[in-house]
Every structure is written in C-alpha cells, then in structure tokens.
Regions:
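His/Asp/Glu-enriched, well-ordered alpha-helical/loop segment
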Residues: 200-226, 296-297, 302-303, 308-378
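Active-site metal-binding motif and surrounding structural segment of the metallo-beta-lactamase
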Residues: 38-54
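Divalent metal-coordination and catalytic microenvironments
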Residues: 8, 29, 51, 62, ...
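N-terminal metal-binding scaffold of metallo-dependent hydrolase/deaminase domains
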Residues: 1-41
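A glycine-rich helix N-cap at a beta->alpha junction
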Residues: 113-127
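Short, surface-exposed loop/helix-turn segments at secondary-structure junctions
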Residues: 276, 319-320, 381-389
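Metal-associated gating/positioning segment near the N- to mid-region
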Residues: 50-114
Length: 389
C-alpha cells in the first residue's frame, strides 16, 4: 500500500528538507520520494490535509499503562491506540504494573503483546525488585530482553549505596539509570506544592526542596561513579539550575519535564479537582517560566506526557484521598504547542529522547523508514471526556 502526502511542511532538523513544503510518497513503509510536486496518479491513497506538518515519529518516554494488574485503568491495546491517535509512534512504558516489570519474563511479555501494533512499545524495567528500593533487579537480563532503561516509577531510591552500585553496574552494558527526584523524608505526607496555595487550602505541602536534595545527591553520586543518569519529570526552577551546572561539568545527566508542568500551576488546586493531583505536584508560575527556559537552553532534554490514567473510583473522591496521576497522551502536543516554539517541542519529542534512550531515529529522507508523525500546529480542539478512548 502506498500513500501520497500533499504539501506537507517537514519539521526535522536532521533532514535536508527541514522547514520545506513537499509532496511525500510512502510505499511499503518507506519514504519512496520527496519532491515539490508528485502527480496524483497510481494505486495509492492521497492525503490532502489542512496545514499538514510532519516530523520524525514522536517518542514519549514516560507512559503508564494498566496492564498487567490494573486493566480497569487502561489496557495495553487501548493505551497503544491512544498513543497512535495522539501522534506518538513510540512510547516507553513505566514499570508500575502488577506484578512490577522487574524480570526478564515481564519484559518479554510486554514486548510480545505489543508486537505488530501501530505504536512501538519499549519497556522501562524496574531498577529494584518490586520497585521497593531494597535490592537491585536483574538489570542485565532485562536489558538483553529489550528493556531500554531502569527506574522505579515515582519511587525514589532512598538507599544511597544502592543508587551508587546501580550507576556503577549499569556501565557494564551502557545502561541508563532513572532516579525519581523526590526525598521522601522531606516530602513527608504532602499532597501539594508547599507554598501560599497549600497553606490557604489546608493541604499538606511538598517543598521543592524535596526535589532539589534528591537531585543534588544523585549528581554527587554520578560525579563519583560515572555512567548515565536520567532524572524524569523535574518540576522546579532550582532543579533546572542544578542539572544545567552538572552538564557544564561534563556529567552524563539528562532530564525530562511533563507537559502539564509547563502550563499548569498550583492555582488550579483552588477547585479541589483531583485531576490536578500529580506527582511531582503542580508548582508556581516562576517554576513554569524556568522550565520553559530550561528547554530553550538545553538544560531540559525531553518533554513527556507522563500519561498515568487513574480509574474514576480512585479519582472522584476527596482530594486528599485521590490517587496521583492524569492522562496526558491525548493533550501533550496541544498543551505544549501553546507555550513553546514548534521546533523545540519536536526536538524534545523526537531526536533527543531517542538518542538518550538508544532508539533509532529515522530522518525524513528518501529511502528511510517512514516513522513519522502528522499534525497541524495551528489546529484547535477542545478535549473532553467524550474524546477519551
């Protein structure tokens, strides 16, 4: 089957056609021809879409799906359909399933179940057994089975020595270690950003300091051990500064930010809407501005949806009792496109995350695999619960 894309603006800094409007013929999964105009003849489907833009396929590095164990939240099949509909050709699935993705067989199960689907699935395996932070999981075996990185989703590694050993051990096979930026002792039982709003609303606060201390610890360890460290979903201005300074020292550290942390503040909590209860918590306008600048400066490498669907029974309750998490795949592009330059978004969703996580990126050139995302940067829509797959 062949498809002809008419008048598509190519956004791909690795392509010789970057920022050019071209016709693109795709045949048998590969880009057969790119030209100013390709005649609309032959046995292929012609797509003429308003303000069509294309880029290398989007890759989301932090997606939670409910299978196995929490299928009431989202099944693997449904989650992959949502990703494809939202423009993502690849996703990395977090280890917070039940049982936890902490073994070779668990990694293989997910890869086999997602085989031959529209969206590629890459497991991020647990760093520790059952994500309890007590004993390192069999990292090498899981890497050989297809795991692309190792981290306990939203669970910080409290044991300093265990984190040190993980960073050292992973170097034997060029493994990427993830460390969630939160110090549990400082965070305590907090459920919202510590500040004026949490005080006014009577909500227990989580100081940004809890994030800073954990990041500082991990950077000290990384400086000692070497290796590669990725810090997922940072949320505060000081975190940007810490990581930027570490990069200047030459440390192999990267980080991501969730799309919602680029646009939403803790002012949203005045409605006590539990859909805004996230980990890390929504922070301040000053933090948002620093995060946006961090993307522009290169201190922040990746934008993720941090998609984490929660069933209504655990969301439609009192704010203090609700589980953290929100759906993000469907809205990530629309949200971030309102506050960032298009090329910054594309870079942080394509070339940068693929390079960091070791996924091949296919430039938009003739002969390459057609791993592409289609979008309209000027399109508008209102996302409602009726749109949820």
């Amino acid at each position: 089957m062949s498809t002809l894309l008419k008048s598509a603006t190519i956004i791909d800094a690795t392509s010789p056609y970057h920022n050019q409007k071209k016709d693109i013929l795709i045949s048998e999964g590969k880009i057969e021809k790119i030209a100013n105009s390709i005649p609309e003849k032959g046995s292929y489907t012609v797509l003429v879409l308003e303000n069509l833009h294309i880029s290398c396929g989007w890759f989301d590095t932090s997606v939670c799906l409910g299978e196995p164990g929490f299928e009431e939240r989202e099944t693997l099949k449904n989650g992959l359909q949502v990703a494809a509909k939202s423009g993502f050709t690849s996703i990395a699935i977090n280890a917070n399933t039940f049982p936890v993705i902490d073994s070779k067989s668990a990694v293989e199960y997910l890869i086999q179940k997602a085989f031959n689907t529209a969206t590629n699935l890459y497991p991020i395996a647990a760093l520790t057994k059952e994500s309890k932070g007590l004993e390192m999981a069999e990292l090498y075996d899981m890497q050989q089975s297809g795991a692309i990185a190792f981290g306990d989703y939203n669970q910080p590694i409290e044991n300093d020595n265990l984190m040190k050993i993980a960073l050292l051990y992973a170097q034997n096979f060029d493994g990427l270690v993830l460390s969630f930026p939160k110090n549990n002792l400082i965070a305590g039982e907090g459920i919202a950003n510590e500040g004026v709003n949490s005080t006014k609303l009577g909500l227990k606060g989580i100081p940004a300091l809890a994030e800073h201390i954990q990041i500082a610890r991990d950077l000290f360890l990384l400086e000692y051990t070497g290796g590669k460290l990725h810090i997922p979903t940072i949320s505060s201005a000081k975190s940007v500064t810490l990581i930027k300074e570490a990069k200047k020292k030459g440390l192999q550290v990267t980080c991501s930010v969730a799309a919602h942390h680029l646009v939403l503040t803790d002012n949203e909590l005045h409605s006590f809407d539990s859909n805004f209860k996230t980990t890390p918590p929504l922070r301040t306008h000053q933090d948002i501005k620093a995060l946006q600048k961090g993307i522009k400066s290169g201190a922040i490498d990746i934008i993720t949806s941090d998609h984490n669907p929660i069933d209504i029974e655990h969301k439609k309750v009192e704010f203090s009792e609700a589980k953290d998490g929100l759906i993000g795949l469907e809205s990530a592009f629309g949200v971030v496109n309102t506050v960032l330059d298009l090329e910054d978004f594309i870079s942080c969703m394509t070339t940068k995350p693929k390079e960091i996580f070791g996924i091949k990126n296919y430039s938009i050139t003739e002969g390459n695999i057609a791993d592409i995302s289609l979008f309209n940067p000027k399109g508008t829509s209102i996302f409602t619960k009726e749109n949820i797959l």
